[in-house]
Amino acid sequence: MAAKDVKFGGDARQRMLRGVDILADAVKVTLGPKGRNVVLDKSFGAPRITKDGVSVAKEIELADKFENMGAQMVREVASKTNDVAGDGTTTATVLAQAIVREGAKAVAAGMNPMDLKRGIDKAVIAVVEELKKNTKKITTPAETAQVGTISANGEHEIGEMISQAMQKVGSEGVITVEEAKGLHTELDVVEGMQFDRGYISPYFITNAEKMVADLDNPYILIHEKKLSSLQPMLPLLESVVQSGRPLLIIAEDVDGEALATLVVNKLRGGLKIAAVKAPGFGDRRKAMLEDIAILTGGQVISEDLGIKLETVTLAMLGRAKKVRIEKENTTIVEGAGASDDIKGRCGQIRAQIEETTSDYDREKLQERLAKLAGGVAVIRVGGSTEVEVKERKDRVDDALHATRAAVEEGIVPGGGTALARASTALGNLHFHNDDQRVGAEIIRKALQAPLRQIAHNAGEDGAVIAGKVLESNDYNYGFDAQIGDYKDLVAAGIIDPTKVVRTALQDASSVAGLLITTEAMVAEKPEKKAPAMPAGGGMGGMGDMDF
């Protein structure tokens, strides 16, 4: 086992604080509308330019083991805030730095660290309640757009696009962000259920120009197994031909004689038909086929349920207004399923989302829910260069998360104002001793840190700005760093999602409290490497020999 290096008390805290400062100073330059960019070196490809706090935090690794521990703890703050709220990582980092700094001073002055932490925790609970009390719910698309615009660093186009996407797919729809191939950023909304399987054979195409198969008002056969022979389903095919409507077959696979027969019938014009493979794999495939069946009002033809192809009737098939099949995607529009059944299925999926502990499973369940309940929107981010596209994509991701958070929990005035004003809640608290009171005082000072940093990044004096803002009794009155003026921030559209502000404070105080109460640190001692052998220069003592 390698030897360990141990540091105690003030020495440990000082080393840790240096690490906290290095990471926080690199992250906090990005805060606010006039925050700067940070360039991240990559081991391959061009450097990455970003204004995303968590991306900067994740890149920082310090040589000194003790300093690195402090930096990693604050990195954890940024990551946790990002996971829960999706934005506010820089605010959380600034708060954590402020709490740790003030806390370290208090401990050095002889305060009890555990009482300080209790005071900090009590103060944070009071501030969170104050934030909730002053929260305003979002009701209009314009307010949604404002939140997106603020988080995208004042880019109005992005805010508008996110607002449109949320209107179209609803609160449970899925919105994804991708890189576009062109210069422009665009919004693409898929209505209905789309899954990533295309036609099995290009002979099913109905529109050769666009390379798609369009089926209007089709029947949909949902089969769990592979189809190799059509013999068992001939009675069903005859019924479909008599009805004069097209047929879509969704099965594990269609091959051999079955595929050849379908293609020949399609080409001769006797049967309007198309076949696609079932989406997903294993148990997820069964669940997705069940989703399609509920959406279209059909049944999954499965031998597990005792249903054989020979006994299938038209009543067991699903129906939809339109189906479009492309090379790699199939979209079912306006399925004929009963709305109560669809709602019931959505409730079932929501319950599974609540129960699952896997992020991957949660994401897949969320996608299934969106396909049933809302729809899917894709924001394709464009730009002149790859570096620009990546930087914009970071901002769009942040804006999207912030907007979702705002719809979920409401909004408060932005620009760090809500936190600074929430310190009024600390006046009525009662503490068991003076050390706990000092803990609350640490939070009171830290609450001004984001407002001061936003002002500082805009080239103003943070202390003067904070003082001027807190002089006013108007809750919405604050500093607009973009213009350098004081105004009603909510009316001006400068707003923050309550969830983002709340999460940033809770995560920052949690980790900062742990750092303050640290009394010893243990790290691996760097091994002293033995000096390398000198370059070989022949045998010594032979230089003056005669040959």
Swiss-Prot record:
**MF (Gene Ontology):** ATP binding; ATP-dependent protein folding chaperone; isomerase activity; unfolded protein binding
| Annotated residues for binding of ATP | 30-33, 51, 87-91, 415, 496
Disulfide bridge positions per record: none
State the InterPro entries in the record. Chaperonin_Cpn60_CS, Cpn60/GroEL, Cpn60/GroEL/TCP-1, GroEL-like_apical_dom_sf, GROEL-like_equatorial_sf, TCP-1-like_intermed_sf
Question: Which of the seven top EC classes does this enzyme belong to?
Answer: isomerase
Query: Which residue ranges run through the membrane?
Result: none
- Principal location class: cytoplasm
- One GO-annotated biological process of the protein: protein refolding
- Pfam families linked: Cpn60_TCP1 (PF00118)
Gene Ontology terms: cellular component: cytoplasm
| Location within or outside the cell | Cytoplasm
Q: How does it assemble?
A: Forms a cylinder of 14 subunits composed of two heptameric rings stacked back-to-back. Interacts with the co-chaperonin GroES.
NCBIfam families from the UniProt entry: GroEL, PRK00013.1, PRK12849.1, PRK12850.1, PRK12851.1
Query: Which purpose does this protein serve, as stated in its record?
Result: Together with its co-chaperonin GroES, plays an essential role in assisting protein folding. The GroEL-GroES system forms a nano-cage that allows encapsulation of the non-native substrate proteins and provides a physical environment optimized to promote and accelerate protein folding.
State what protein this is by name. Answer: Chaperonin GroEL 1
Organism equals Gluconacetobacter diazotrophicus (strain ATCC 49037 / DSM 5601 / CCUG 37298 / CIP 103539 / LMG 7603 / PAl5)
